[in-house]
């Protein structure tokens, strides 16, 4: 397959950088942008490139010559005058007698070109456009596709202010067949995105190839700097779909938007105020943002696939307006229960995609080479947690929406909302601490290393303990985690002032923990953080684990607990944040605002102020 690269861009917005060279020759970490494209083509076995040049073409010719030094044959077509993205290609009609690849020479790209070619051939496409969501769709050329990827509409910029759209943008990479040429006019300046594709998508078999791989224009100094950072950090190469990807799978209702029952029209769809910030945070990371949502409203005949698409258009438009994007959306329109009036029987089936089955996660993992073991599932229901666990993901519940109430499948992590969860996953705030703990464990001469994690309620102790446990396991270090909340008395047996040591049965707790360390088996009734959860029996037994993690409010509160610890961590929290989290947590548990205020005023002097003093005993304090 021949390749045509449009390499005549002036790059006027780059100012002095393109004073003496064309835009594709702008240096990026000591190498012209165009050279990155040439090297990519060589890597995927392309053997012949035609560079369409005009403005300041000599620097390109001097650098690349005939391509021999780069392992590829390069020829040049010199335009007499600039003819946009179309004119030069029309002039090459006699040479381009088979399908050919078109690149824009001012785009930094890193993608699996073999996948692209296979997609094009598999669809028997006459024109394949590489497309992707971006963070500024409102000023980009947009396309709409059906379930098979067939392009059913092309919407060139500019767009009307009230347009509701799917965030799917022309990424300026195409595979075209000779069938395109009758629609191109010789000698006339034209643009594929603005003038040609909107006119021919009904005449040609035209498909969109959606990829999360790296494709960015470098038209401004800020974008150039951003791309340079991504190249240097390795992000550009990591996004190639030859490499295993990481994803954050997102449930929709109750996580991204307010959980109105059975949303079946756009006017009932409302994003949470924090959602765009959270998804934008994911977009800055190596994680893909992928929605997996059960939408039985189709099976119930409350809406159609097209109607569901209109709801998703609203979601994508509002996110795009805020600079956020979803890399992909997977939905299950089915429901297994039949026999209801007005149902859509075509979708009343027992499918493989409806959560808690992992079908949607598995499909996304196949489509984008995602490793579920490096990925997260964020949801608000037991079905979400079940799907995530079945696929092998780390599971995260949020307190919004259903809030995982009345669930038997517990998550790995619990956060207030999507933003809090996304910040934790992306920022990985305990990464350095985990490295320190791993070093302690691997160098300790003790048979078992005991680490205590103390701090006030809602300070993040459990989150920290879970993270450390997972990081240790990933390095092959077995860990026994002792959660001190399991010694908390049932609510009916606690004393009125919420005296912390009484409520934790401190004498029994100290004795039991010492017994566990000595190798004895301890069985407890356990503790549940939510009144809708079943209380489950807990058994603790040390069975050769290298590390014991003791985690709880009172973990540093007594001399006996401190004495058995080899490394003591205190998780601190400001009073304002503690109060905020407490109100969120007890609201999730069903308390009224008034009762939470009373609880705060009672527990602050009898627990929070008391536990805060334990910071002085820590070997390490974590904010």
Language-model regions, residue ranges each:
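Catalytic-core segments of class I nucleotidyltransferases/pyrophosphorylases
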Residues: 100-101, 108, 114-121, 134-137, ...
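ATP-dependent NMP and nucleoside kinases share a basic, alpha-helical "lid"
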Residues: 313-316, 385-386, 534-585
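Conserved Lys-Pro-Asp/Glu-containing loop-to-beta segment of HAD-superfamily phosphomonoesterases
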Residues: 101, 343-346, 352-385
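Conserved nucleotide-sensing/catalytic segment adjacent to the nucleotide-binding pocket
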Residues: 480, 489-536
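Acidic, Mg2+-coordinating phosphoryl-transfer loop and its flanking beta/alpha structural elements
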Residues: 376-413
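N-terminal nucleotide-binding beta1-loop-alpha1 segment
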Residues: 1-19, 243, 247-253
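Small-molecule kinase domains that catalyze NTP-dependent phosphoryl transfer to phosphate-bearing small molecules
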Residues: 403-406, 589-623
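Conserved N-terminal catalytic core of the sugar/cofactor nucleotidyltransferase
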Residues: 2-5, 31-105, 110-115, 220
């Amino acid at each position: 397959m021949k390749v045509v690269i449009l390499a005549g861009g002036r790059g006027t917005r780059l100012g002095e950088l393109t004073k003496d060279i064309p835009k594709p020759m702008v240096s990026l970490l000591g190498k012209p942008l165009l050279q990155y494209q040439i090297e990519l083509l060589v890597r995927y076995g392309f053997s012949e490139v035609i560079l369409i040049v005009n403005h300041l073409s000599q620097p390109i010719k001097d650098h690349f010559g005939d391509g021999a030094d780069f392992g590829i044959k390069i020829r040049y077509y010199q335009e007499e005058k600039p003819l946009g993205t179309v004119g030069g290609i029309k002039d090459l009609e006699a040479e381009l007698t088979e399908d050919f690849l078109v690149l824009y020479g001012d785009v930094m790209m890193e993608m699996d070109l073999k996948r692209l070619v296979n997609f094009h051939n598999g669809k028997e496409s006459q024109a394949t456009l590489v497309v992707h969501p971006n963070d500024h769709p409102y000023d980009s050329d947009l396309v709409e596709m059906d379930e098979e990827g067939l392009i059913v509409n092309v919407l060139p910029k500019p767009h009307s202010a009230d347009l509701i759209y799917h965030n799917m943008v022309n990424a300026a990479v195409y595979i075209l067949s000779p069938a395109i040429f009758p629609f191109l006019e010789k000698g006339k300046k034209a643009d594929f995105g603005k003038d040609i594709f909107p006119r021919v998508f009904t005449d040609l078999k035209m498909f969109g190839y959606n990829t999360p791989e790296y494709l960015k224009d470098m038209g401004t100094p800020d974008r150039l700097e951003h791309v340079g950072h991504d190249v240097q950090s390795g992000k550009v190469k990591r996004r190639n779909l030859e490499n295993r990807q990481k994803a954050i799978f997102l449930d929709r209702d109750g996580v991204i938007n307010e959980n109105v029952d059975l949303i079946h029209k756009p006017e009932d769809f409302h994003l949470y105020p924090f959602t765009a910030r959270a998804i934008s945070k994911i977009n800055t990371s190596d994680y893909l943002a992928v929605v997996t949502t059960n939408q039985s409203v189709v099976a119930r005949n409350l809406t159609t696939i097209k109607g569901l698409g209109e709801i998703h258009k609203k979601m994508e438009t509002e996110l795009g307006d805020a600079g956020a994007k979803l890399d992909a959306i997977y939905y299950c329109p089915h429901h297994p229960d039949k026999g209801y009036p007005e149902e859509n029987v075509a979708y009343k089936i027992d499918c493989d995609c409806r959560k808690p089955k992992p079908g949607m996660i598995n499909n996304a993992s196949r489509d984008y080479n995602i490793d579920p073991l490096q990925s997260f599932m964020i949801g608000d229901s037991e079905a979400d947690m079940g799907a995530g666990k079945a696929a092998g993901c780390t599971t995260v519940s949020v307190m919004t929406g259903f809030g995982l109430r009345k669930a038997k499948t517990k998550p790995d992590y619990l956060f207030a909302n999507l933003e809090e969860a996304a910040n934790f996953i992306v920022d990985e705030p305990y990464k350095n601490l985990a490295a320190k703990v791993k070093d302690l464990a691997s160098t300790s001469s003790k048979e078992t290393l005991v680490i205590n994690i103390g701090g006030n309620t809602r300070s993040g102790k459990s989150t920290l303990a879970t993270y450390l446990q997972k990081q240790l396991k990933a390095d092959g270090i077995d860990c026994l985690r002792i959660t001190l909340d399991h010694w908390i008395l049932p609510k009916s047996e606690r004393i009125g002032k919420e005296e912390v040591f009484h409520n934790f049965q401190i004498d029994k707790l100290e004795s039991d923990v010492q017994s566990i360390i000595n190798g004895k088996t301890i069985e407890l009734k356990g503790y549940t953080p939510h009144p809708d959860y079943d209380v489950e029996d807990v058994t603790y037994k040390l069975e050769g684990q290298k590390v014991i993690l003791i985690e709880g409010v009172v973990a540093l509160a007594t001399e006996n607990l401190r004495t058995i610890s080899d490394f003591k961590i205190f998780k601190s929290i400001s009073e304002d944040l503690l109060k905020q989290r407490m109100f969120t947590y007890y609201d999730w548990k069903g308390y009224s605002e008034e009762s939470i205020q009373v609880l705060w005023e009672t527990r602050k002097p009898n627990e929070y102020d008391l536990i805060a003093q334990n910071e002085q005993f820590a070997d390490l304090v974590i904010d």
